[in-house]
Amino acid sequence: MMKLTIAGLLLLLAACAPKMGGRISAPQEPLSDSTFVLVLKQMDPFENDGIKVGSIRSVDNGLSVNCSYYEVIEKLRQMARRSGANVIKITRSELPDRKSTCERIWADIYRVPDFRKHEGEIFWHPGRKLTWDDFKGTPSTTSYFQFGAVSSCDLKLESNSVSILKKPRFYTEAVFNCYVSWVRPASRNNAEMLAHEQCHFDIAELYRRKMQQQLDEAGFNAFDMQEGVKRINKDIGRQMGKRNDAYDEETEHGLNKTRQREWERVIAGELDTLKRYIQHR
């Protein structure tokens, strides 16, 4: 069973550039550019079980360029990798205002043995399959009582900074929400149920790629992007909801093993046809 939401984080009609800095007190061996770095928000729980590498920040003095949240986070990830850190814990953030058009972020960075135990959200990745340990929520006692597990997935959308002279670029994510997703204790050894939930996450990624494709091909500008993005967002959400309903119905929530395997093959094939839109993190 899956609960689904779609969130749009949109449209800064300005231009700005971040100033990167920080203090590295315990540098570690640098990580490769392809190594995943976990980003934890201010409200996300975190207990350090590794080494605090230092502190980093992205600020700005006013109007410049390339400083949407997504762009800033990618620059902070690069700084963390160079210092050997695999976790970024945001300690303070400020939204654009009259003093600055940039997203400003301060964070501590850490090197931990296993970043997965600290995840509150999981961004879809072909090499990162769900485990029951990722289902960190408390099972419901009032709803979904007939299900052994519930997974919660979001599609998230953000644009870069946009001006009359600067065309929009869009960033999309398929996200698994660990603390909203849950599994009942009796189902923790059920590998087939886990495969069913993984396919729900794969369906979310499929429609993220469809959304990314439509956004990239739309050719929006600063004047028409607001309504155009809303239209695509709504349409993709409707399609994905129907696909998930059909998946649950035809597989009988994973109990029909033959149909379950068929759905897994179909979704894997559709993902492959849109592999150019995979998100590298």
Question: Which stretches of residues belong to each language-model region?
Answer:
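Mid-length scaffold segments of soluble, non-membrane domains
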Residues: 87, 167, 175-212
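C-terminal motif of bacterial Sec signal peptides marking the signal peptidase cleavage site
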Residues: 13-15
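Sec-dependent signal peptide recognition
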Residues: 2-9, 196
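Short, well-ordered alpha-helical segments
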Residues: 51-93
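Metalloprotease/metallohydrolase-associated module, dominated by Zn2+-dependent proteases
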Residues: 122-185, 221-281
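Compositionally biased P/S/T/G-rich terminal and signal peptide-adjacent segments
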Residues: 21-58
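Bacterial signal peptide processing site
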Residues: 17-19
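Pro/Ala/Gly-rich low-complexity, hydrophilic intrinsically disordered segments
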Residues: 105-131
